[in-house]
UniProtKB/Swiss-Prot annotation:
Organism: Clavibacter sepedonicus (Clavibacter michiganensis subsp. sepedonicus)
Catalytic activity: (2R)-2,3-dihydroxy-3-methylbutanoate = 3-methyl-2-oxobutanoate + H2O; (2R,3R)-2,3-dihydroxy-3-methylpentanoate = (S)-3-methyl-2-oxopentanoate + H2O
Cofactor: [2Fe-2S] cluster; Mg(2+)
Entry protein name: Dihydroxy-acid dehydratase
Sequence positions bearing N6-carboxylysine: K128
Keyword Metal-binding recorded: yes
Length: 564
């Protein structure tokens, strides 16, 4: 076996007389003669002060750097962006959310390639920064470890009628709808506002950030047990230090990201998402990460795995508990062990510890599933996984639904068609949405939006208006991990690409059958052909800047909305 090169790339900037100028610059940032033989490790963080999700990352990056030093490497920290979906929701800012995933992946690749760094510790806290970092790791195929910022603790609110309850950010969106509908006072809305974010950390339910943190651990790209501890918990500092040590160990063993992110590892990640009832955004992100890892992952893989993995997590937005509770009952490893014991995971996949997933779990003192936060395997919430991919005449390339919260097997109703989210929100506010309606929001796809906005504002308003179980919402956009109600997104092809959704008219009958995984427009083909005559999409909303570039490059949601 050939000897492992501990400096597979940084020799370009440290060795020989040609590296004189770069060594001089590296001396200015603290390196010395004793450091030239050490692997250089990029510590990439999406820390910022815009949102509580990322506040722990500056602290954790310092811990990771200490771990790199302890492991025999030399850390070099750099930053990247992060967009807060919670702040960007419901207005123009949401166009930029999914775009930020690509910017993060591209920016990390750019620095890692330009500076010839040998490996990386990647730290993130917000929804799109997690997949962005994992995409970068897969694209670069260097030794890499991912570390999550951790989630926020739930808030506690006492309302004017004396009732008290636990609240998260999602309660605010639903409370806005209730206030507009006249079923909640402005006073109680303000009380909820002040309670939802009691400190640092990502949104606390099994929303997108916690789903993707669980994905990273299930993929083997994060240390075992590192996804669930809260942001403020000092165990995160331990995991930060260990992550820094781990990446140097991976270089010594010659293990790179694609050695870990195999097809079997992606199947493990999907299984964990299904068991938790995680965010539908995981479908989009896993497809994109797999593409970077050169793994052939398809929408059909999600249904295949959902058919055999039960939904076990009684977790918000549809359930009762949050990530802190998952941590309390043993974290992601407890769920992985139960799935492995049931023959539902591949135990021989490699992980960032340098050991297999089975070896990691066997080395941990893990409890059984608690039966409440995470139901027992023989007593699931649903017999199949929490996400389904639908196909049919309205979504030939697919659409995604969170079956974990879909209360009906079949829904059929008349279409109410809106060009973009704002028009639908106005109709709801003005009382023009009725029970039984199928709300169709189009031109919100990856290209047509552009940016495939999340629809949390409208879904929260629908629930707040008391219509959450009585109307169906369809869109070529997507949904927040915190969305509840009868919602189907990621419809492909999207409207701007002449997908069937572009030709739906008010009053058309639409039918969804969850068990059959079908989504159909009940209009005959001759009528649809007539509607296609002379059709043209809405003109581009942006003609310059990052969104204009994105719209020209982005692929279908069925391919993960990738840009490469």
């Amino acid at each position: 076996m050939p000897e492992i090169d501990m400096k597979p790339r940084s020799r370009d900037v440290t060795d020989g007389i040609e590296a004189t100028s770069s060594r001089g610059m590296l001396r200015a940032v603290g390196m010395g003669d004793e450091d030239w033989e050490k692997p250089q490790i990029g510590v990439a963080s999406s820390w910022n002060e815009v949102t509580p999700c990322n506040l722990s990352l500056d602290r954790l990056a310092q811990g990771a750097k200490e771990g790199v030093h302890a492991g025999g490497g030399y850390p070099l920290q750099f930053g990247t962006i992060s967009v807060s979906d919670g702040i960007a929701m419901g207005h123009e800012g949401m166009h930029f959310s999914l775009v930020s995933r690509e910017v993060i992946a591209d920016s990390v690749e750019t620095v890692m390639m330009a500076e010839r760094l040998d490996g990386s510790v990647l730290l993130a806290g917000c929804d799109k920064s997690l997949p962005g970092m994992l995409m970068a790791a897969a694209r670069l195929d260097l030794s890499s470890v991912f570390l999550y910022a951790g989630s926020i603790a739930p808030g506690w609110v006492k309302l004017s009628d004396g009732t008290e309850k636990e609240v998260t950010i999602i309660d605010a969106f639903e409370a806005v709808g209730a206030c507009k509908a006249g079923t909640m006072s402005q006073e109680d809305l303000t009380r909820i506002e002040k309670a939802i974010c009691p400190g640092e950390g990502a949104c606390g339910g099994m929303y997108t950030a916690n789903t993707m943190a669980s994905v990273a651990e299930a993929l083997g790209m994060s240390l075992p047990g590192s996804a669930a501890p809260p942001s403020a918990d000092r165990r995160r500092d331990y995991f930060a230090h260990r992550s820094g040590e781990a990446v140097v160990n991976l270089i010594a063993k010659g293990i790179t990201a694609r050695d870990i992110m195999t097809k079997e590892a992606f199947e493990n990640a999907i299984s964990v998402v299904m068991a938790f009832g995680g965010s539908t955004n995981a479908v989009l992100h896993l497809l994109a990460i797999a593409r970077e890892a050169e793994v052939d992952l398809q929408l059909s893989d999600f249904n295949r795995i959902a058919d055999r993995v039960p939904h076990l997590g009684d977790l918000k937005p549809f359930g009762r508990f949050v990530m802190n509770d998952v941590d309390r009952v043993g974290g992601v490893p407890v769920v992985m062990k139960a799935l492995l014991d049931a023959g539902l995971l591949h135990g021989d996949v490699m992980t960032v510890t340098g050991r297999t997933m089975r070896e990691n779990l066997e080395a941990m003192d893990l409890a059984d599933l608690d039966g409440t936060v995470i139901r027992k395997m023989d007593d699931p919430i649903h017999a199949t996984g929490g996400i389904s991919v639908l196909h049919g005449s309205l979504a030939p390339e697919g659409a995604v639904v969170k079956t974990a919260g879909f209360d009906l097997d079949v829904f059929e109703g008349p279409a109410r068609v809106f060009e973009r989210e704002r028009a639908a929100m106005d109709a709801l506010t003005e009382g023009r949405i009725s029970k039984g309606d199928v709300i169709v929001i189009r031109y919100e796809g990856p290209k047509g939006g552009p940016g495939m906005r999340e629809m949390l504002a409208i879904t929260g308003a629908i629930k707040g208006a008391g219509l959450g179980k009585d109307v169906l919402l369809l869109t070529d956009g997507r949904f927040s991990g915190g969305t509840t109600g009868l919602c189907i997104g990621h419809m492909a092809p999207e409207a701007v690409d002449a997908g069937p959704v572009a030709f739906v008219r008010d009053g058309d009958r639409i039918r969804v059958d969850i068990a059959a995984r079908t989504l159909d427009l009940l209009v005959d083909e001759a009528e649809l052909a007539a509607r296609r005559e002379g059709w043209a999409p809405l003109p581009p909303r942006y003609t310059r800047g990052v969104l204009a570039k994105y719209a020209k490059l982005v692929h279908s949601a069925a391919e993960g909305a990738i840009t490469g």
